């Protein structure tokens, strides 16, 4: 596993990696080049979209899970898609969180189709003038 982080925090995570038996290679965004992600099974971005905007073109060379949902799509997601890679975007993560929360709060199955349709409508219309 390679972790590309905004700052070098390897010392913080070394004990956990050892405990889990995971070998982690570390890099910062400044070190990251396309060679780091080419051939990766998946690239996961868990930071605000603005944190990777400067590096989106270099990093958008692998299948992507990007949990950011504002802006939609992120520059990283647009770069990955433009390079022909599948993307799973933050609104999908948001929807699944909402399904789970609905079920936990109400004790009833979430109306997933209706919730998904409402989310898609909101995403499609959010940047249009009212």
Please tell me what each predicted stretch does.
Residues 7-11, 31-35, 74, 113-117:
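Generic alpha-helical secondary structure signal
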Residues 20-88:
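Rossmann-like adenosine-cofactor binding region
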Residues 11-18, 57, 81-82, 117, ...:
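Polar/charged alpha-helical tracts
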Residues 1, 24-26, 123:
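Extended hydrophobic/Leu-rich segments
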Residues 1-21:
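NAD(P)-binding Rossmann-fold cofactor-contacting core
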Residues 67-130:
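Adenosine-phosphate binding glycine-rich loop
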